[in-house]
Every structure is written in structure tokens, then in C-alpha cells.
Amino acid sequence: MSFRQKRTRIPLLAMTVTALAAAVCGVTTAPAATGAEVAVPLSVGAAAGNATPIPGYVIQSSAQVSDDSAVSKPGFPTSGWYPVSSRSTVYAGLLQNGKYADPFYSTNMQNVPAAQFSVPWWYRTDLNVDDTSSRTYLDFSGVLSKADVWVNGTKVATKDQVNGAYTRHDLDITAQVHTGVNSVAFKVYPNDPNRDLSMGWIDWAQTPPDQNMGIVRDVLVRRSGAVALRSAHVIQKLNSALDHADLTVKADVRNDSANAVQTTVAGTVAGKPISQTVSLAAKERKTVTFPLVGLDRPNVWWPAGMGGQHRYDLDLTASVGGTPSDAAKSKFGVRDVKATLNSSGGRQYSVNGKPLLIRGGGYTPDLFLRWNETAAADKLKYVLNLGLNTVRLEGHIEPDEFFDIADDLGVLTMPGWECCDKWEGQVNGEEKGEPWVESDYPIAKASMFSEAERLRDHPSVISFHIGSDFAPDRRIEQGYLDAMKAADFLLPVIPAASARPSPITGASGMKMNGPYDYVPPVYWYDKSQKDRGGAWSFNSETSAGVDIPTMDTLKRMMSASELDTMWKNPSAKQYHRSSSDTFGNLKLFGDALTKRYGASANLNDFVRKAQLSQYENVRAEFESHSRNYTDSTNPSTGLIYWMLNSPWTSLHWQLFDAYMDQNGAYYGAKKANEPLHIQYSHDNRSVVVINQTSNAVSGLTATTKLYNLDGTEKYSNTKTGLSVGALGAKATAVTVPAVSGLSTTYLAKWVLTDSSGKEVSRNVYWLSTKADTLNWGGSDWYYTPQSAFADLSGLNNLGQSAVGATANSVAGADGTTTTTVTLKNTSGGRLPAFYVDSKVVDSAGKPVLPVEWNDNAVSLWPGETTTLTAKYRTADLKGSKPSVRISGWNTGTQTVPADGSGPGPSDPVDYQAEDATIVQGAVESNHAGYTGTGFVNYDNVAGSSVEWTVTVPSAGTYDVVVRYANGTTTSRPLDFSVNGSISASGVAFGSTGTWPAWTTKTVRVTLAAGVNKIKAVATTANGGPNVDKITL
């Protein structure tokens, strides 16, 4: 918003702010707040240009209110009302007050009575005004979806006037305001995205029970003199040489007094003075256009990785008789954006004359629209950590601060309207969303004007989608275009995210052909299927659907029985996938996982196989588009992965989850989007080097190696002297020939080194001699079935390997800590340590999130070493010392200290029971006090066992410290064996009193240097104790 000033946010109450922060993180345990009121009314200053956000409200159902006019009268009793933050839906406010259990867990949200949200809810607050000589306004948008507005007992706007989530309102309440305490109240009406031009959740997640009714943006209390200054902005035009920009400053001045006035509007733009005097009749409004300002050698704004992110300031004051009346401040960037159609009809974006491949994801806010600036910044930092450059916002257009963050980070944004509800109800046939009535047209036009005004000066914004699945009809489109013209929104306008054209703007240059559910990696490379989602043109939203989170997150979001159903019966309805029947289960994904990787033995096995599947699929999706970007015909020009993140704890459409944890999909995307990258083509076996940096590179060496699963090398090739251009250019290193004697499942490793021999890219694939074959003729809009499946089940028999690990941490002055982890394959033989994942954890074994790794999910052959770094907020350790939990497909799990003191040979290493091999037992989490993601509950049978794979640097005697619980009154003995030989028999594990009471037992064993297997076997019909972990 061009006139929005930077400000310090004013807390509602310390208690409620803390509760909100917890709620945004998915924790909804907050102090009860019934009977509480806002402690002190907001003091509203009288200075010209003062814009103070209302810090919070108390809310209550209108069913509890008998007299509407009384609510906004000072002194109205609000005992029993709920204090909420400045931007809060009704349900979010009730969560903030601890009224309902964590909605991110299990089916808790399903149990919330929805009837209470079928009536309006009141939002009430008090303002303290000491000086009424200034005029007073309420300036706001973000009401879902309509409201009556009351001030001091007077209705100043009706729900027919305040209608639409994006419409902006500037209510002059000067006549209602008096000295002292004043009261403002919004009567917010129920939201229905199918009937209202607001926000809905389509098939992304379960719909909140209140459908997000509430106020989700700031309401500003503005003060000014007779003349109000609005809509200050800069139209900038950058020349092709990037060495000069012309700046045109415009602003609206409005005389709200009953007398004619003369006002002088003066200030600076990019440090250069400007001034103009204007005469205004009573109640007259004029647009002031200042003379052109030239800017030589401007600091041009660039996307991240292409240059800097400089922004200039605009600072204006409107004065009457030499006295300031109103003021406006804003920032803007100097840059040029184009989005033209190439010869194949695809949409090609360029910034400052440089074409670029759009690589992004579909962004979503929190399911309850709870704004958290830190969380939003974390998400956009993940975008850069992934190597992406763009986010698409389909509806749910975030507040001003979001775009400020994107501007500062250099993340491109593609906002636009959403599909599948009222926004497209006039044009989408039988799909959801009611057809428009006459009153919808001005609301849509006003929404477009408001958002265009707000977004136009943000250099991160590169276009606006006026349609998603469907383009608007002529009347709707003309309204949008007229609004954009009036708002001086000069960026590209995209008629639809699909291939549907609009009557005026014409072709979209984009496609939305799916898939949205499982397809194999080879799918993405096929350009011959013109109605499918392969890597050609601009793919505005697509993915292989399911993205299973890590076990850490799954334990936080689903009950034990739900997790059991998830892996045993993927065809069952999954509440945490989607409300849609099409995407309500995991059947397509589960079937493919079993056919390609083999049947899952247990939950852990299902989850780890899911990570491999997601990694290979997401990697292929991005790699195929990067490879095809420079094709001479029908190139790929953009890919928006569906989606970047999920609004809640979800099983699909996410590169990272609601808790910011990173799964296989994340690391597959990160690998594919390395700045300088070597990759394999699933369709034609070519090995290609992609350079996404701004500089050409030469002197590269590409090495190819193929291995059977027993470690035998079957093919090797080295290509030297490779050169590759900049900004998405590619060079082919080799095409892998047919190789005889490969195992059905085999491994491939590609390494790219620079002219100094330094490794700059490593990429490991697990492949099959049996191909995935697609049945294109059986395609549906959301997936394409397979007639044959690759066989990757050989990975289940990959022999054990060993990883040695050391870690160290350094806390920085900026409040972050960097943990460095060095991994080495210490096994003898030929087997790699495959898919080794590292996590920074706190003293309780919980992941420290968010975290930015330079690389992860790595594979190392014997003797190979890699060093990883992880950066995170020191405060997220919550006072504990960091450790690193390291788990690999064939290495077991270990936890090494990383507390900054430096690891030594005697440092203990933890091995979690839930990551071990379990026979006749189950991983559970129903008793508190465990570490990691759970514990093992032995079946009540002799012979049930847990077997850990451990690594030690040298042969000798070691203490195995077993952390266990036994809630019975009898001992549950275990036999311990090492590498198949009994080491300790009948070790007693006595009662601990209760199951949540944990203690330790030490068992001394003799281990060989390198990899060992330690098995603990129950010797009685009672089975063993619950085992949390062993520490070696």
C-alpha cells in the first residue's frame, strides 16, 4: 500500500500475543480469556499522516447481543467476550483463547460445532482520542466477507457497502468521534466462498468450520487535517541499457472540509525534491501528477541470484497554509518486467531484459489466515534455499508485509484470483461457485482496484492472474482492466492460469493440464502429449500429488490408529489429505509405491519409501523443465510446483510441511535447482549440465558411474572440458548407452567438478532395468495410469553400510547458529551409505525448525566424505544443546552431539528404537517422555526383538545404555546379541512403576570396528519393556 508507514506493532495483551504465536506454530494451548477485555483503549495521535492499526478486539456471537446499536457505545459490558489479535478470523480467535484443541492434530477440527458460525460475530474495540481538531478515518480491507460498521452507536457503513475480502474502505468518522473514549464495532457476517467474493480452500485442505469469517488485515485509524493524501505511488520506466529511469509520481488529494483550500504537496522521490500546489473546492478530489524525475545509473532491482534488491523511498506531505495536513511514505523498486508469448505460444517472463525460467511453487497462508511475519519470511527463505525464484498466490493474497519481505529477498510473486468458487462462478459451468448477480460486478472491480493499488509498487510482483482455471468473460474482464488502468497497474495481466483465453487480453500462454496425483518420474519429459502436463510451455500448477511428511511431523499430526490406517490401507479416506473425493485418499500413490518399491513392512518402512519416491519424482519434475527450457521448439518457460507449502498438517501438495520440516520432496527440489547442476534424463538417458547462474562456466568435468546393488561398478565415463552458458543454458555431457549385466535395481552417480577439481554438483539416482510405462490413453484430468512399473524393490536388500559423523556448532551475533556436519562412509567393501538424512535436534530429540541446509539426503560410497551445514535460529533450541540425528536407508540411525565443544572419541551416540529393525513389535507414542518420534512396544511373545545397526571407530568393549519403561510389576528380561552371537543373557528390565516413567539399564558388549548389529530379544511370553533408544 503506497501510503502505509512502517510502524511498531502494538500488542493487544501480552497473553494473547503469546497465544497467537503459539497458534501460528500449530499449538493452540492458550490461557482462557473469558471475561477479559482490552486493558487500555488505543490512544490515537492527532499528527498529520498518523496511521495507527487497531491492536485487537473482543469478539462475541451476535446471538448473545440483543441491541446492535449498543455494542459500539463506550462502556458497553464485554464480560465473557474473547480478546483476539488485530487480524483474526472467529475460529482463530477461539483457538487463541484455548476454547478448542489443536486443529492441526487428528480430526480435532471436525469436532468443532459449525452452527455457531452461521450467525454474525461482533468485533469491538475502544479508541482514546485526545484531540478532535484532526479528521479521523477508518481505512481497511480484509473483511470476510461483509460487515456493518458502527462508531459510538452510529452505523457508518452497511454490509452492502463493506462487502468482499479485498475491497478497500476509507470511512470518514470525524462526525462520530468525540474527545475521550470512543468505540468501534464490526458486525461481521458469515463467509461463503461459493456466494461471496472472498477466500476459500477449494481442495487444498479441510475447510475451517467458520469458513474464515472475520477481519484478517489491519484496520488503520488515520488522522489528517482538511486535506487527505491518498494513493501516492511511482510509475517508473527503465531504459533497455538499465542506466536511466524516468519516475512519475502521482497522488490523490481530497478536501474533506466544507471550504475551498489550497494545498502544497511536497517531498522527495529517490532523494530528489518534488513539489506542486493544488486548489481544491469543498469535498473535491484531484490526482496530482508531478513533473518527470530522471534517475541516472539507478540501482536496479533484480530477482535473487541475478543482482541486488534495492528499493527507493517516496516521501510526501500535503500542507495547508504551511501546516502539514497529511503524509505518505512508501518504497518502490526500479525494474522492467515483460511476459510475452514465444513462437510456440508459451508465456516467457523477463526481468530487466533477461529472460528467465520461472521455477516456483504455489504459496498458501495458514489455514486460519493467522498472519505471522516471521513465519512468512521463513517460507520465502525456504524458496531461496530450494533454488526457486517465484511463488504463485492463487487467491489468499497476503498482507503488505509479505510483499515487502519478497521485495527484500528477491522472490518473484504472481498473485491472482482463485478458482472453483464465486470468483469463477459466472464462467465455470457446473463447478462450484454461484453465477454472478448484478451487485457482484462492482465488488469485483473494487477488489481489483484495491489490490492493484496495493501491489503496483512492489518490484517482486511480476503479473496478476485475473483468472485461474477459467478466464473471465468480457464484462468481468473489462471491469478488471478498467480498475487496473485506473490504479496505474502496468504489469502483465494474465487471463488465466490454464490455457483458456479471455475475450480482450487473449491467450494466456499457460497450461493447467495436471497431473495432481501420482505419476512416475518419466512422465515429465514427454512433450508429445499436448493435453498433458509434461515439460513444455508454462506449467502454472502441477505435481505428482502426495507428499508424505517426515515421521517427526506425522507423529504430531495423526493418531496411532490413523497412522496405522495410512500405511496399511492407502485406499481409506484420509482427513489430512483433502476434502475432495478425488484427492481424499492415498490409493494411487500407495499402489505405485508398493509396485515400484515393494510392500511396506511397517509404518517406518512406508514413510522412508515415500521419501525416496517423492525425492525422485519432484527432482524429475524440475529437472525436465530445466532441460527443456532452451529447446528451440515448444520450450518449457515456467513451472509452479503444486504446492510450495500446505496451510495445515497435510499429506499432499507440499515441499515442506506446516511445521517447516523438510521431506524427500524438499530435497528432490533442492537438488534439481542447484545453481550449477548435473542431471540425468529419464526419457533419452542423456546427462545434461544446467547453469542457472548469471555467468557462463567452462572447464567442467562430468563423471558418470553405474553400480549394481552389490557395489559392482558396471559403467564409467568422464567428460572433460565442458562449457555451459548462463541463465538456464545447458550442455550435454554424455548419453548413457545400454549396459549389460545391471541388477534389476541399480544405482547411478553423477559428479560435476570445476576447473580446479572442486565438486560443484553430485546427483545420485536409483533406477531400474524395468521401465515405468504410461497408459496415455487412460489419462484423466488429474493423473495418467501406468501399464508397467519400474522395479526398485532391490533397495530392500541393499547391504548395510556405515557412516561416521562429527558435528560442531557456532552461534552467530545475528541470533542464528550454524551447525556443521561431516559425514564419511567408513565401511570397508563397495556399498554406499544410501540416502543419509541429517536433522538438527534439541535435547529432547525434536527437530529444530526452520532450518536451512546447504545439502541433505546424500549418498556416499566407501571412503567418500561430505560436509553439510545447517543454519537456524539459536532461540529455537530453547536453551538446549544441539545434536544431529543421522539416519540412512542402510546405515541405521545415530545422534551425535553438536554443541560447539567439538566431538571426541568418547562422546555418546544415540540410536533410536523406532529406527531399528523391529520383529513382533510396534512403534508407538502414547506414553509421554520418549525421545525421537516414539518408542518400541514389544509384542507379548518370546522372540520379539529390536535390532540396531551401529558404527564404532575401533574394536573394543562398549557400554550400551538402554532407555526403557516397564509399567508392570514383573521384570521383562532381554537377551543381547552382537552380530548374531549372544553377548549378554537374561538381562533384567524391572518395573519402573508406570509406562511414562523412563529409566536406563547398561549392558556391556564387545564390538568390532565399523558396522555392528545389536539385537535385544524378549525371552518370556510377556515380551520386552518399552524401549526408547540405546546410547553407545
UniProtKB/Swiss-Prot annotation:
UniProt entry keywords in alphabetical sequence: Carbohydrate metabolism, Chitin degradation, Glycosidase, Hydrolase, Polysaccharide degradation, Secreted, Signal
Signal peptide: 1-32
pH dependence of activity: Optimum pH is 5.5 with chitotriitol as substrate, and 5.3 with (GlcN)2 as substrate. Activity is lost below pH 3.5 and above pH 8.0.
Thermal dependence summary for this entry: Optimum temperature is 60 degrees Celsius. Stable below 50 degrees Celsius, inactive above 60 degrees Celsius.
CBM6 domain residues: 909-1032
Record: active site: D469, E541
Classification via PROSITE patterns: CBM6
Propeptide section residues: 33-46
EC nos: 3.2.1.165
Gene Ontology BP annotations: chitin catabolic process; polysaccharide catabolic process
Protein name (record): Exo-beta-D-glucosaminidase
